[in-house]
């Protein structure tokens, strides 16, 4: 009888351990599935800001009238047979602080016309190019489609397999955007007075390898005058971010300020984000 009792007791203890173990695992699963996870928001904001900085480098290069003596060097290679030119922005092999960020490597632009001319087509790739020690890879295509119905210059921006290699992992993005130049079109050699309204959508992967999609639900205002005091130029607008394993997040870019503060909204709860 005593032996039977001990066996029953042992079975009961083992059963309790197993039940407790599975209960703990269930709780861990629930804890790990953080419904307030903002990884997709952080990663999209980083790659968005990287694209904006590259676009600024391209605009800055196009308004330069001659090759500079200091880094970065602007090198133009003509190809008469194809009616295309190549513009290389060369920062060198070591980090160089330019337009607010550390850069090294090359940005390579193949183009057929000046940036602000109707029909201009710019295809941009990279050679060992880093921004703030993050390796940038992929392709950007910018097309000037001429004047729209509002008599403003309109651009189409295609993002093709853009990768940002960070210390935490790789961020990937593919997207299509429309950029309307609503102010500054009359002074094509002074890009800091440009204001764009931007709409579009994209899909990508975060550093945690979870996929996401984004859609601009209220046009983003790109105020390039903000470059005078900040590296953040989006002063208002709304973006919907939809990670594959979480619910919708809303990015609210603010109220016309040239700051780097953005609100991520999840089910009416607001979480401040700061980009730099």
Can you name each region flagged by the protein language model?
Residues 20-23:
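C-terminal motif of bacterial Sec signal peptides marking the signal peptidase cleavage site
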């Amino acid at each position: 009888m005593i032996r039977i009792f001990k066996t029953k007791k042992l079975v009961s203890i083992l059963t309790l351990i197993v039940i407790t173990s599975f209960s703990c695992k269930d709780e861990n699963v629930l804890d790990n599935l953080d419904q307030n996870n903002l990884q997709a928001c952080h990663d999209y904001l980083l790659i968005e800001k990287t694209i904006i900085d590259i676009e600024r480098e391209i605009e800055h290069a196009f308004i330069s009238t001659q090759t500079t003596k200091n880094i970065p060097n602007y090198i133009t290679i003509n190809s008469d047979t194809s009616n295309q030119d190549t513009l290389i922005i060369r920062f060198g092999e070591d980090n160089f602080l330019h337009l607010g960020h550390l850069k090294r490597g090359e940005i390579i632009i193949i183009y057929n016309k000046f940036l602000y001319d109707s029909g201009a087509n710019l295809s941009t790739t990279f050679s060992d190019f880093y921004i703030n020690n993050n390796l940038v890879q992929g392709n950007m295509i910018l097309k000037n489609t001429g004047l729209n119905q509002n008599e403003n210059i309109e651009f189409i921006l295609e993002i093709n397999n853009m990768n940002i290699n960070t210390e935490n992992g790789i961020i990937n993005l593919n997207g299509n955007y429309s950029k309307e130049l609503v102010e500054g079109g009359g002074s094509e050699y002074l890009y800091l007075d440009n204001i764009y309204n931007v709409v579009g959508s994209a899909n990508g992967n975060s550093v945690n390898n979870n996929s996401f999609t984004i859609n601009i639900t209220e046009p983003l205002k790109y105020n390039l005058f903000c470059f005078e005091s900040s590296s953040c130029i989006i002063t208002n607008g709304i973006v919907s971010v939809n990670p594959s394993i979480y619910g919708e997040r809303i990015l609210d870019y603010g109220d016309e300020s040239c700051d780097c503060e953005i609100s991520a909204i999840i089910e009416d709860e607001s979480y401040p984000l700061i980009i730099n």
